[in-house]
Curated annotation (Swiss-Prot):
The keyword Transcription does not apply. InterPro entries: Beta-lactam/transpept-like, Glutaminase. This is Glutaminase. Its EC number is 3.5.1.2. Gene3D superfamilies: DD-peptidase/beta-lactamase superfamily. PANTHER family: GLUTAMINASE. GO terms for molecular function: glutaminase activity. It comes from Alkaliphilus oremlandii (strain OhILAs) (Clostridium oremlandii (strain OhILAs)). Substrate binds at S61, N113, E158, N165, Y189, Y241, V259.
Length: 305
């Protein structure tokens, strides 16, 4: 497997030049555009890695999967989906167009920014400090990495430039989708997106979902399996933004991307996969990372369809 992974990475490196680093979060322009790596964690305990698998990046929108599960655990699916929909939009991840023109005025799904902000606003806690601590503790539990932390420079960069997210949040507050203090909820959202990870960390999140919420180390079921299935279904239909349909056809596994260049993928009952490639395509997905997953899926026949 090791040789095959190295070969797949090398065959996709040429795509890096055709992508770009995101510019709307200034700190993300400091990323190494040429980085490309993969980490695979399997339910039988075996692990495979290649390339820049230890490269550190911020989790960004991949965090939306975890906060969705937390909100579902806190409130149950019926209430959460009164506040956010389940359908793909076909629009860019940061688009606010349908939020205003479609009734009822709620975000289409939890994987776009508006939906994720609404979901994060539902995470329970008596104070902002308790809420971010709950998020960090759950991330550490699922990844098995007690050293996870927020990248402060990315967090401050996102907070200072997040005007579009701020506009969406205040609109959702106005129509009753978001409860509580808008700036407090946005601050929580910016922090969750700025958690620094490696391919191994997001592969472990994928592994957790592949077992429907069982921790590999303990064999303990720590979430409702139904909530894991909901997350994977939404990853399949909405996780790669407005390229989700194409990804489902070409790769065929649940996945969630982030503008930090990461992609977290799940092969149900088998493995979790973490890929990093900061150079993004026009949809906001890792341009080489998508190619790597497509080749890997074909080689190992991973498609769930």
């Amino acid at each position: 497997m090791q040789i095959e992974l190295e070969k797949i990475l090398n065959q996709n490196r040429e795509k890096i030049a055709f992508g770009n680093l995101p510019t709307y979060i200034p700190e993300l322009t400091r990323a190494n555009k040429d980085a490309l790596g993969i980490y695979i964690s399997q339910l039988d305990g075996s692990e495979f890695k290649a390339g820049d698998y230890d490269y550190k990046f911020t989790i960004q929108s991949i965090s939306k999967v975890i906060t969705l599960i937390m909100a579902l655990e806190d409130w149950g699916a019926e209430y959460i989906f009164e506040c956010v929909g389940k359908e793909p939009t076909g629009d860019a991840f940061n688009s606010m167009m349908k939020l205003e023109i479609v009734r009822p005025s709620k975000p289409f799904n939890p994987m776009i920014n508006a939906g994720a902000i609404a979901v994060t606003s539902k995470i329970k806690g008596k104070s902002p400090e308790e809420r971010i601590q709950r998020i960090m503790d759950f991330f550490k539990l699922v990844t098995g990495n007690p050293d996870l932390k927020v990248n402060e420079s990315i967090y401050m960069s996102e907070k200072s430039t997040g005007d579009r997210n701020r506009a969406m949040a205040y609109f959702m507050k106005d129509v009753g989708v978001i409860t509580g203090d808008v700036e407090e909820n946005l601050d929580l959202y910016f922090k969750q997106c700025s958690i620094e990870v490696t391919c191994k960390d997001i592969a472990r999140i994928g592994l957790f979902l592949s077992s429907d919420g069982v921790l590999l180390e303990t064999g303990k079921q720590i979430i409702n399996p139904k909530h894991s299935k909901i997350a994977k279904a939404l990853m399949t239909t909405c996780g790669m933004y407005n390229a989700s349909g194409e990804f489902a056809i070409n790769v065929g596994i649940p996945a969630k991307s982030g503008v930090g260049g990461g992609i977290m993928a799940v092969v149900p009952g088998k493995m979790g996969i973490g890929v990093i490639g900061p150079s993004l395509d026009e949809k906001g997905n890792s341009i080489a990372g998508v190619g790597v997953l497509e080749q890997l899926s074909k080689m190992l026949e991973l498609s769930i369809f």
